[in-house]
Swiss-Prot record:
A Pfam family recorded for this sequence: Hormone_1
Entry protein name: Somatolactin
Localization per Swiss-Prot or TrEMBL: Secreted
GO MF terms, alphabetically ordered: growth hormone activity; growth hormone receptor binding
Family of the protein in this entry: Belongs to the somatotropin/prolactin family.
GO cellular component: extracellular space
Lineage, uppermost ranks: Eukaryota, Metazoa, Chordata, Craniata, Vertebrata
Record keywords: Disulfide bond, Glycoprotein, Hormone, Secreted, Signal
Tissue-specific expression: Pituitary gland.
GO biological process, one term: response to nutrient levels
Annotated glycosylation sites: N145
Leader sequence segment: 1-24
Amino acid sequence: MYMMTALQRGVWASLLWPYLITISIPLDCKEEQGSLSRCPSISQEKLLDRVIQHAELIYRVSEESCSLFEEMFVPFSLQLQRNQAGYACITKAFPIPSSKSEIQQISDKWLLHSVLMLVQSWIGPLAYLQNTMDHYDGAPDMLLNKTKWVSEKLISLEQGVVVLIKKMLDEGILTTTYSEQGLFQYEVQPDMLESVMKDYNLLSCFKKDAHKMEILLKLLKCRQTDIYNCP
């Protein structure tokens, strides 16, 4: 039953994957020379809509990837072990509000910079995750493709958020004291089980942060249209 569930999920994902790719509208922020020049030609409202769509898709695919990885490589007993062990997420130290009341109180400026902080903190770890999963025995192509897709779309999302900050705030990027190297270590795990659990924790934490990105961006959108009735 356990393997059948994973197989069925893989079949459905294979059928829906081309559709998901089709409906994803590119941000088109980067030209061949590497300069950000296409996004500035898009209206602020349309750019925000595209950024939100990217965040929605990234969260949806990260959720599917986490579930598929869980079913293929992490027995239920190990899922409980992760919860009991209290694995920490790499963004735990970030000064980003988590409760609804706290989020409602932060400014538009900090909303945008919080999203950018989350996006940039995950680019390296997702590249690492993509590399390690290539060495898994029996890892389905669907899982590998989803991980690669999310990694690429995250870079696109970063470009869109950077331009959005310039459009909405008319300023550059805030500098932070957090560095990706200080938050995430790329050491090789000597034990396969330990490596699997670390990768599972990364996927679970990214799914959580991807959802937070989506929530923050949708709150920003709400404030632009109906500031007095935002959830």
